[in-house]
Every structure is written in C-alpha cells, then in structure tokens.
Regions:
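TPR/Sel1-like alpha-solenoid repeat signature
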Residues: 128-134
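Residue-level detector of conserved catalytic or cofactor/ligand-binding positions
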Residues: 192-202
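A solvent-exposed, charged loop/short amphipathic helix patch at secondary-structure junctions
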Residues: 145-164
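Short coil/turn linking the two alpha-helices of tandem helical-hairpin repeats
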Residues: 60-61, 67, 137-146
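Conserved, well-structured interaction surfaces
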Residues: 1-63, 81-119
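Long, well-ordered core segments of solenoidal/helical folds
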Residues: 101-109, 178-188
Length: 202
C-alpha cells in the first residue's frame, strides 16, 4: 500500500516539484532561443504550462493541499525562509491548475490531437480531459466538505479543506466532461467498448 511512510511518498513529492521548476525555467527562458520560430516557441511554452499543471494535479491527488510556487522558480541560492512555503488550500490549488490548463487550451498553440507522430506531447484533448478529471476530484467527498480534514490547517489557522459541501462543483465537473466528450468525439476519439458476454475482450 501507499501512504505517507512509503519511500515513494517523498520521492514523488521531490520529483514533481523538480519537474515544476524545470517547466517554469523553460517558460521564462525559451523566448531567448530566437533560432526557433515564434510559433514553435509558443507551442513549447503552452506544452510546458500544461505539463506543469499536470504535475501539480498529481501532487494534489497524492498529497492533498500543496504549496503553489507560481511563475518564478525558486532560485538555487534561496534562503531557508524562501524554501519553506505554506500550503495553499484545495480550492486555490484547483483554481490554479484549471486556469493553467485553460490558458494552454486557449493559447491556440497546442495541437488539437497529438496523434502518433507526436505521442507524449500535451494537446488540447489531453488538457480538457485533465481539467474534467480535476473538477471531478474537486467535487468528490474527498475534497468537497470533508469534515474529517477539519484539523488540517496552516500555522496561521488557514483552513485547507473546504468544510461545506458545494454541489455546484458537481455541475462544473459535468460540464467539463461534456465539453471534453464533445470535443474528443469531433477529433475521432471513441469510447472503448466492452462485450458483456466477454468482459476481457476489448
């Protein structure tokens, strides 16, 4: 099983934040690479922004409320005070990740669907799917009015888990999935079909 005492727990935490720092550094500096066309640099930046949002999503999924670093990566010579970041609330984390994904979607730089020639690259379909999944987590009892987490606060008393259930979050998740399904269908994606009589047959 995976819990806070697992060796992987600290490893995932550090690896994802390292990836976030690399993405932020790339976003800030890629325009210095004038050998690449502006359109290419824009595509790279949007891909990096989407990847950074994905890393934050994985951190939120694994650890709950996490510190959001923002646009500026922490400098190598940062003081201890600069390194210690208070956690952001669940709502702040979700809103940040959703905004980053939407920014990548709206940029016009990403491919609609990466396809075989660009496997592994972030595209609009992936960003929309991730945003929908993010909203589903947000609406779930895990993050939506979870009174079991009432004691999870920052040192200043800031509440990190919302303590009142908000049913409108389910509507946001539903709408996000509807938008994704409509878009994905238009891009040629299809649902995997399972034959009831042969459950192991794709």
């Amino acid at each position: 099983s995976f819990n806070s005492a697992s060796a992987q727990a600290s490893e995932y935490f550090s690896k994802y934040y390292q990836a976030i720092a690399k993405a932020s550094t790339f976003i800030q500096n890629v325009d210095k690479c004038t050998e690449a066309a502006a359109s290419t640099r824009g595509k790279w930046k949007s891909e990096a922004r989407a990847l950074r949002a994905y890393y934050y999503f994985e951190l939120l999924r694994l650890y709950g409320p996490i510190p959001l670093i923002g646009e500026d990566p922490i400098p190598l010579d940062a003081s201890l005070e600069e390194l210690i970041k208070e956690r952001n609330s669940v709502d702040e984390c979700v809103n940040f990740i959703a905004t980053e994904l939407q920014s990548a979607i709206d940029s016009g730089d990403l491919l609609q669907r990466a396809g075989k020639a660009n496997l592994g690259r972030m595209d609009v379909a992936t960003c929309m799917a991730l945003k929908a999944k993010l909203y589903l987590y947000w609406a779930s009892p895990l993050f939506n009015g979870n009174t079991d987490q009432a004691s999870v606060k920052n040192k200043d008393g800031k509440q990190l888990f919302p303590q009142t259930e908000d049913n409108s979050k389910w509507a946001q998740a539903r709408d996000a999935y509807e938008r994704f399904m409509t878009f994905a269908t238009g891009q040629g994606y299809k649902l995997s079909l399972i034959h009831i009589s042969e459950p192991t047959r794709p």
